[in-house]
Amino acid sequence: MKQELSTGEILDLLPHRYPFLLVDRILEQKENKIIGVKNVTINEPFFQGHFPGHPVMPGVLILEAMAQTGGVLMFSKEENKGKIPLFAGIDKARFKKPVYPGDRLIIKVEIVRMVKGIGKAKAEVYVDDNLVAYAELLFTAV
């Protein structure tokens, strides 16, 4: 398992493509933990309507960035090569602060349990060392 991954290497693992790829780089990867980055720019398509004159990243896309980062971790594992990651559920999601254009999301995901092909993960997103969102995620693969 490679420690750092570029966007190209992420594209080899995930089926997501522009404009829906929401993780730009992997900074660190261990057996059950990963740290990813999403650089949020004013050019993101969702800022056109969310909200005009006061752009804020939609919370559901922050959750999707968490899920994609967790997906990179799952699909870096040999036993999951060639499968498609699916987001199976979410619990305890909270948004603490808004995310604006120019923010750099640091996305931390830890897989805490794998049972019969379903993984449970804890995820946190930070901007400038401030917690902006967290959730528990469920993953599976087909």
Regions found by a protein language model. Give the residues of each.
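Hydrophobic beta-strand-centered segment that forms part of the acyl-chain substrate-binding groove
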Residues: 2-4, 70-106, 132-136, 140
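Short aromatic-glycine motifs in intrinsically disordered, low-complexity regions
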Residues: 7-17
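Beta-strand-rich interaction surfaces with strong enrichment in secreted/lumenal proteins
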Residues: 11, 53, 95-97
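Catalytic strand-loop segment that frames the active site of acyl-thioester-processing enzymes
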Residues: 18-57
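Intrinsic-disorder/low-complexity, polar/charged segments enriched in Ser/Thr/Lys/Arg/Asp/Glu/Gln
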Residues: 21, 31-35, 104-106, 120, ...
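Hydrophobic beta-sheet segments that form the core/acyl-binding groove
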Residues: 26, 91-128
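Active-site helix/loop of acyl-thioester processing domains in fatty-acid/polyketide metabolism
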Residues: 26, 57-80
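Flexible glycine-rich active-site/ligand-binding loops centered on an Asp-His dyad
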Residues: 57, 125-142
